């Protein structure tokens, strides 16, 4: 269980791990982000398990319970692939940053909705941008 961590809502039609890019043909409404408690209960603990026979067959090495290091070496990565921001998203984030280096929660939600990003992506972009500005200011020679 993860305490104090809210699941990040995804825009409709996207799966976890997909890149979200700006799509001007689809504007999101608040109802797009909602889900009923029944949906949450049915999805909890429902991880599809791959059949053991598909892993044993083919060119993949068999899982050896006596050798956990070998299993770790052949484990699949669960990391999401890197999704670069579109030029439009970057431009809008930079404009927002020039206006205000820190976002309120409401403004972060609004920016995320407008750019078809998650609130977490916007938050982390602003954190990274502040660190970049700090580094630029530190490296600049003092006169």
Curated annotation (Swiss-Prot):
Localization per record: Nucleus
Disordered as annotated region, ranges: 1-75
The keyword Transcription regulation is annotated on this UniProt entry: yes
Any one cellular-component term (Gene Ontology): nucleus
Any GO BP annotation: anterior/posterior pattern specification
Keywords on record: Developmental protein, DNA-binding, Homeobox, Nucleus, Transcription, Transcription regulation
Family from the record: Belongs to the Abd-B homeobox family.
Domain of life: Eukaryota
Function: Sequence-specific transcription factor which is part of a developmental regulatory system that provides cells with specific positional identities on the anterior-posterior axis.
Lineage, highest ranks first: Eukaryota, Metazoa, Chordata, Craniata, Vertebrata
GO molecular function per UniProt: DNA-binding transcription factor activity, RNA polymerase II-specific; RNA polymerase II cis-regulatory region sequence-specific DNA binding
Name under which the protein is recorded: Homeobox protein Hox-A9
Chief subcellular location: nucleus
Name of the coding gene: HOXA9
Record field: compositional bias (Polar residues): 21-44
